UniProtKB/Swiss-Prot annotation:
Record lineage: Bacteria, Pseudomonadati, Pseudomonadota, Gammaproteobacteria, Pseudomonadales
Protein name, as recorded: UPF0761 membrane protein PA0951
Localization annotation: Cell inner membrane
Chain ranges passing through the membrane: 36-56, 92-112, 132-152, 174-194, 207-229, 244-264
Organism of derivation: Pseudomonas aeruginosa (strain ATCC 15692 / DSM 22644 / CIP 104116 / JCM 14847 / LMG 12228 / 1C / PRS 101 / PAO1)
Keyword check for Cell inner membrane: yes
UniProt similarity note: Belongs to the UPF0761 family.
Keywords, sorted A to Z: Cell inner membrane, Cell membrane, Membrane, Transmembrane, Transmembrane helix
InterPro entries with a match to the protein in the record: UPF0761_bac, Virul_fac_BrkB
HAMAP family: UPF0761 (MF_00672)
Major location category of this protein: membrane
Membrane topology of the entry: Multi-pass membrane protein
One Pfam family linked to the record: Virul_fac_BrkB
Top-rank taxon: Bacteria
Length: 411
């Protein structure tokens, strides 16, 4: 029991470190800023899509009210009134205004994808038709799915009202769980579809459940904070709704991005996190496995790498592949597999060290031992290199920068 608790604490610390390293708070701030401009366009698009289907006619306002009642703290009621007014006015725009709203909505989706790709270490975002189709699917299918879900909710409610509470056993419980179910579905779809990387559906679902529960808890606590500590009302008066709503949007994006960090790192094993090998060592180990597979006439995928003892998670694998593909070491073989397509006999380690984006590890970060035949001579060479560097550059800066030193001068 204690071991599981320690593992949980270790994993939580690891997630917190990754959350900060991936600049998630900065991304949440950028998304908050973008949301201010995109919330009205997104709602306008939602109403437009729902109005195309007669069965969903007039349901947009009901969905908007449902969202604000269940996903925004009570302090957002005033904002809801303003947004309804803005959305009503936006429906009377000319085609130029409609295009501007669509571009604004797409900009928000681009910012979300950029933040997720940063977390998943994806350096090559979607481009062209693939990106457009994804965004169009979100903007078009999202409102339709919301409309369908809300229609089911309305049907269950009306059935209970007309035929009594016994018409559908558990209807009250089901209706109470609908907001949480919508949140789980939305977050699961977000985590599985938006990153330009392979995300296991099981991990996306686990992250969706975690984020939805955390979101509900945060909504309750935020509502209590606003009601018990009305400092914003005292300072801003009638305008207090604006900073409170901004703070809630920022907190919401922080929760969403933390859930993304969780989903991304569910594939990382406890053993791999504890080893914390320098990225250069991992790169050489991966190249060694590629070479072995090439000699056998076989391609390589992440599962093969795991069987060889390199248990790196999906995001690190994608990051290494990005570098290896740019340097023309590997090529796609189809089916998610890769092959070595460069003669390693014509590529020196010195060149790799110069081209590698990750720094050479210090002596303290080098593992004492590694079950790889190439590692002992590499370790000795790195130690010799660091000894020579210390001998060459061990003098103080005052020695190097003073007049008349033996250091080289630029003329």
């Amino acid at each position: 029991m204690r071991e599981h608790f320690n593992d949980g604490v270790e994993f939580a610390r690891f997630l917190a470190h990754r959350f900060v390293t991936d600049k998630a708070p900065n991304s949440a701030a950028a998304l908050t800023y973008t949301t201010l401009f995109a919330v009205v366009p997104m709602m306008t698009v939602m109403f437009s899509m729902l109005s195309l289907i007669p069965a969903f006619h007039g349901m947009g306002e009901s969905i908007q009210t449902f969202i604000f009642r269940n996903f925004v703290p009570s302090a957002g009621e005033a904002v809801e009134t303003y947004l309804k007014s803005f959305t009503t006015q936006a429906r009377h725009l000319t085609w130029v205004g409609v295009v501007f709203l669509a571009v604004t909505a797409f900009t928000m989706l681009v910012t979300i994808e950029k933040a997720f790709n940063e977390i998943w270490r994806v350096r090559q975002p979607r481009r062209g038709v693939g990106r457009f189709l994804l965004y169009w699917a979100i903007l078009s299918l999202g409102p339709l799915l919301l409309g369908a879900g809300f229609a089911v909710t309305t049907y269950i409610t009306s059935l209970s009202l007309l035929h009594g509470p016994d018409a559908l056993p558990g209807a009250e419980t089901l209706l109470g769980l609908m907001p949480l179910a919508f949140s789980v579905a939305a977050f699961t779809l977000l985590y599985s579809a938006v990153p330009n990387a392979r995300v296991p559906v099981r991990h996306a679902l686990m992250g969706g459940v975690f984020t939805a529960v955390l979101f509900e808890a945060a909504k309750t606590l935020f509502g209590l904070y606003v009601s018990l500590f009305p400092g914003y009302q005292l300072i801003y008066g009638a305008f207090a709704t604006v900073p409170i709503f901004l703070l809630w949007i920022y907190l919401s994006w922080m929760i969403v991005l933390f859930g993304a960090v969780l989903v991304c790192n569910l594939s990382s094993s406890r053993l791999w996190r504890r080893r914390s090998l320098p990225k250069l060592i991992v790169l050489l180990g991966v190249l060694r496995v590629f070479l072995q597979r090439q000699q056998l006439g076989q391609s390589l995928r992440l599962t093969h790498l795991h069987r060889a003892g390199w248990l790196l998670p999906e995001d690190e694998w994608e990051e290494l592949l990005d570098f290896l593909e740019k340097e023309q070491f590997v090529c796609r073989a189809g089916g998610g597999e890769w092959v070595l397509c460069r003669d390693l006999g014509a590529y020196s380690l010195h060149r790799l060290l110069n081209r590698c984006p990750w720094p050479m590890p210090s002596r303290e970060r080098m593992p004492a031992s590694l079950d790889e035949a190439w590692y002992p001579p590499f370790q000795q060479a790195m130690e010799r290199l660091q000894v020579e560097q210390e001998a060459l550059f061990g003098e103080s800066l005052a020695h190097w920068l003073a007049d008349g030193t033996s250091g080289a001068k630029v003329t």
